[in-house]
Regions:
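Single conserved hydrophobic/aromatic residue that forms the stacking wall/gate
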Residues: 1-13
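Acidic/polar loop patches that form or flank catalytic/metal-binding clefts of enzymes
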Residues: 16-19, 67-75, 163-166, 207-225, ...
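Conserved beta-strand elements of the Class I
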Residues: 28-31, 101
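Solvent-exposed loop/turn segments at secondary-structure junctions
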Residues: 34-37, 76-80, 105-110, 168-173, ...
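Glycine- and acidic-residue-enriched helix-capping/strand-helix junction motifs
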Residues: 35-64, 115-145
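An anion/phosphate-binding loop that grips the pyrophosphate of nucleotide cofactors and donors
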Residues: 96
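Catalytic cores of nucleophile-dependent amide-cleaving enzymes
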Residues: 133-137, 141-192
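Intrinsically disordered, low-complexity Ser/Thr/Gly-rich stretches
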Residues: 217, 225, 230-232, 236, ...
Length: 306
């Protein structure tokens, strides 16, 4: 229960159709390479797991609604560009009322590898691992790999509402994706109970209160991009795009709303230090319970240190 609650604090960065209603007899298509893969729910250097020890996104959704209302198709892999599953995914989406696409990346090690007597892994030219993140895995771009973006775009043409769940170990670019989907949940690696936690968020049993601990860039050309860059005489500007990230550090949405009021600031100054105490009143003004991350940003306008 503790694990499920912690993972439920994942970030919702777009939520125009969330939360979904339970027991409404609507067909749900669950599609994507991260929808039903236990190791893709976990981080790098994960030890071998039993199937029963990890709840995938698909299993979590099935635990929440009638199994007959859930249609699953993998669709594509993380990196492999084989098109063998595309048609099944399109058929599943066409027969559903709403589509949940579980995409992203993976740090999953391949525990099915065979090894030589020397200990070296046998490599097959026909096998392309899902792994695109973790130690020793660098990227030249931050786009969704393989056919993932193409699959999102093809399903968008069907006119069905799309909820995108991103399971991943690094920030990924959302340009070309935001306009194709109706909601985005940034789940990172949600862990062993991730499927149940994700279903709680999707169906409104838990209000996602997480906020981004990084900034998500608009392109790799913006890197490095973070919330507290050193102030210089010239601010970063680009000829091709704006200088601010797509989603800033601390960003996140909620199923409810909060109102701040009565802020009080007190100073306790000494010869060597200055302690600032800040108090603020927060009221939940919405219809759902929820958590709020109070964020305070400070900037030293004049400092003797750089």
């Amino acid at each position: 229960e503790i694990t499920t609650r912690l993972v439920g604090s994942e970030m919702c960065i777009r939520d125009s159709i969330l939360p979904l209603k339970k027991n409404c007899s609507k067909k749900i298509a669950v599609i994507g390479p991260n929808a039903d893969n236990i190791y893709n729910m976990l981080g790098d250097y994960t030890a071998p797991q039993t199937t029963a020890s990890v709840v995938t996104a698909l299993e979590g959704i099935k635990n929440k609604v009638d199994n007959e209302d859930v249609i699953y198709a993998k669709g594509c892999a993380i990196r492999d560009t084989s098109r063998i599953g595309i048609r099944d995914a399109l058929n599943a989406a066409a027969s559903a009322d709403v589509v949940i696409m579980v995409m992203g990346g993976s740090s999953a090690r391949d525990f099915s590898s065979e090894y030589e007597e020397t200990g070296a892994a046998k490599v097959s030219a026909n096998l392309i691992s899902d792994m695109e993140s973790g130690e020793g895995y660098d990227r030249a771009t931050l786009n969704l790999m393989g056919l993932q973006l193409e699959l999102i775009q093809e399903i968008k043409k069907l006119g069905k509402p799309i909820i995108l769940v991103l399971i991943k170990g690094r920030p990924l670019l959302l340009e070309g994706i935001i306009q194709e989907v109706d909601a985005i949940i940034d789940a990172w690696y949600p862990g062993m109970q991730g499927g149940n936690a994700l279903a709680d968020v999707l169906f409104g049993d838990y209000n996602p209160g997480g906020r981004l601990s990084i900034s998500i860039p608009r392109s790799v050309g913006q890197l490095p991009v973070y919330y507290n860059p050193k102030r210089t005489g010239n601010r970063n500007k680009y000829l091709e795009e704006v200088g601010v990230p797509r989603y800033c550090f601390g960003y996140g949405l909620s199923y409810t709303s909060f109102e701040y009021s009565d802020m009080e600031v007190t100073l306790n100054e000494t010869a060597d230090d200055c302690i600032v105490n800040i108090r603020v009143k927060i009221v939940n003004t919405g219809q759902k319970s929820g958590d709020e991350v109070v964020q305070l940003y400070i900037c030293d306008d004049v400092s003797s240190y750089t």
